[in-house]
Structure formats: structure tokens, C-alpha cells
Regions:
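An alpha-helical support segment within catalytic cores of ATP-dependent transferases
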Residues: 2-10, 110-183, 236, 278
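Conserved N-terminal boundary motif of the eukaryotic protein kinase catalytic domain
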Residues: 13-21
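ATP-binding pocket architecture of kinase catalytic cores
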Residues: 21-136
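Hydrophobic packing residues in well-ordered alpha-helices of helical domains and bundles
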Residues: 95-98, 160, 164, 272
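Active-site Asp-x-Gly
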Residues: 134-139, 148, 180-183, 190-247, ...
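Hydrophobic alpha-helical segments that form the core
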Residues: 250-258
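ATP/Mg2+ or Mg2+-diphosphate-binding catalytic cores
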Residues: 259-281
Length: 281
């Protein structure tokens, strides 16, 4: 892998490569830290299947002030990004900073829920067919679409799929339409936040679309990424409507739980069953 990657890095940067080493990657591609002969460093992510990620990074750079790695070059086979000096833990101050920049991101709006193209999450197709109603978009393009991906892959039992379909028909009992569609990172958890000191230096691996900010906030609680310091600061900027913690958070967690079930199977099914049982009885 490395020799062709070196040639691509030298071609697209116009600089000589001195050394490479592997970094822990995501669900798509191999990731290399490339040291250049002039002392610079870039990160190379090797595909195929990388075009959507490059497109999303460019979209966020154009439409938001979210901290991002600068994209030097992007196509379906390679993404080249400036190396972001990071690696610190998410402190309370860094959580508060994450809340500030995500609240700013969520202030960017569009005429519909969805996007004018499909994107990916963890390498899986993420359907973004625009819809004027959030409840319909979440039901069809998030909950049912990802449940079907998991079922087709043999990771979601038919009985669970049937219960999710029943729940999908009743979402209006609990979910609310937001004031407007909000631009979402879509995959904001600890592994996709590069922290330096008391700030998030960059958000990586986006899965963007316009949706309800609450789905982003719910996912942020799934692995304990966002805690009291985050939510205190976020609500100073954009207060949450009553009922998020009591009801809506669990319903929105079904989407990332289904993504993880499709990718990894196993233990995530129990979380899905717990939530479905709670709302269907």
C-alpha cells in the first residue's frame, strides 16, 4: 500500500516524502501519517470509496466554521489532509468548546431536511432524499432505511425489524418538528473529535445532512462523549425543549444503534430491543 501512496502524496503536494506510519483509521480505508522532507506532515487516507468524505469536508468548510482538517486533495482513492496536532482527552472546557461550535453549526439551515446528495456514515450509505417534514425524514431515511440495511446484512432479526416498523408508525406521539433544518456533523463522538488542550482542534469523519439538532446531541451521549459541561453550554446558546432526556433521546439513539448493529452486530441489538420495548410496551 505504502509505495503507491507515497507517489500520490508527492504528486498532489509537490513535496518529497521522508517517512510514513500507520494511524488508527475509521471504517473506510487505511490512514497514514506522512512526514515530508521539508518538515511538514500530512495525513493520507486511502480508499476506494472516499469521494463522499472529501465532498463533506469541503461542504462543511464552505458552509460552517466548524474546526476541520484542511483538505489538501480529495478523490475517491485518496484524501490528503493537513496533520492536526491533537491527542488530548476531552476535558470539561473542551466539551464546552464542542458545544459552542456545534451550536454554531446547527444554526446553519436549508430549505429541507436531508441534503442534495446522499452521504455515508461509517462507510454505509446514508440516504438524504429531501423532505419538508423532519418526522417523515427521520422515519423513512434514518430509522427504516438503516434497519433495512441491518436486516439485509443478516444483523437484525425479522421480529425486531417488524417491531421497529410498528414503532416508526407511532413516532408522532413523541417526536417534534424543529424550528428549521439544522446542519449536522452526523457522527460526533469521541473518536471523531481531535482535542488539543481545552479546545476541539478538529472534527473528522463527518456524515452530514440537515436534520434535528437533537439527533446529534443524542448520539453524543451514546459513548459518553458529551456530558454535563457540554449540555450546560449548549443550552445557554440553544435551549432544549422539554422531553429530550425523558423520551426523545432514546428514540434518536435508535439510528446510531442501528448503524453499529449493521457494522458490528452483537451487543448493540440489546440496546435496540430495550428502546423498542420501552416505547411499544
Amino acid at each position: 500500500v505504502t509505495a503507491p501512496a507515497v507517489a500520490l502524496v508527492e504528486r498532489f503536494t509537490g513535496r518529497k516524502v521522508a517517512a510514513t506510519r500507520s494511524l488508527s483509521g475509521g471504517c473506510v480505508g487505511k490512514v497514514l501519517l506522512v512526514s515530508l522532507a521539508d518538515g511538514g506532515r500530512v495525513v493520507a487516507k486511502l480508499g476506494p470509496g472516499l469521494e463522499p468524505e472529501g465532498w463533506m469536508l469541503r461542504y462543511l468548510a464552505r458552509h460552517s466554521r466548524l474546526p476541520l482538517p484542511h483538505l489538501v486533495h480529495g478523490d475517491d482513492h485518496i484524501l490528503l489532509m493537513d496533520y492536526v496536532e491533537a491527542g488530548d482527552s476531552l476535558t470539561p472546557a473542551a466539551e464546552a468548546h464542542a458545544a459552542e461550535v456545534l451550536a454554531l453549526l446547527h444554526a446553519h439551515s436549508w430549505h429541507s431536511f436531508g441534503l442534495d446528495r446522499d452521504t455515508v456514515i461509517g462507510g454505509l450509505p446514508q440516504i438524504n432524499t429531501p423532505n419538508a417534514r423532519w418526522l417523515d425524514f427521520f422515519r423513512d431515511n434514518r430509522l427504516l432505511a438503516m434497519a433495512e440495511q441491518a436486516r439485509a446484512a443478516g444483523r437484525l432479526p425479522a421480529v425486531t425489524m417488524a417491531r421497529i416498523e410498528t414503532l416508526a408508525g407511532r413516532l408522532g406521539n413523541w417526536l417534534m418538528e424543529p424550528a428549521q433544518p439544522a446542519l449536522l456533523h452526523g457522527d460526533a463522538w469521541t473518536g471523531n473529535l481531535l482535542v488539543r488542550g481545552d479546545k476541539v482542534a478538529a472534527f473528522i469523519d463527518p456524515a452530514i445532512y440537515y436534520g434535528h439538532p437533537e439527533i446529534e446531541l443524542a448520539f453524543g451521549t451514546m459513548f459518553g462523549t458529551f456530558n454535563e459541561p457540554f449540555f450546560r453550554r449548549y443550552e445557554e446558546i440553544s435551549p432544549l425543549a422539554p422531553g429530550f432526556w425523558e423520551e426523545r433521546r432514546d428514540l434518536y439513539l435508535l439510528y446510531p444503534l442501528l448503524v453499529h448493529t449493521r457494522l458490528f452486530g452483537g451487543s448493540y441489538l440489546a440496546g435496540i430491543d430495550r428502546i423498542v420495548d420501552r416505547f411499544l410496551g
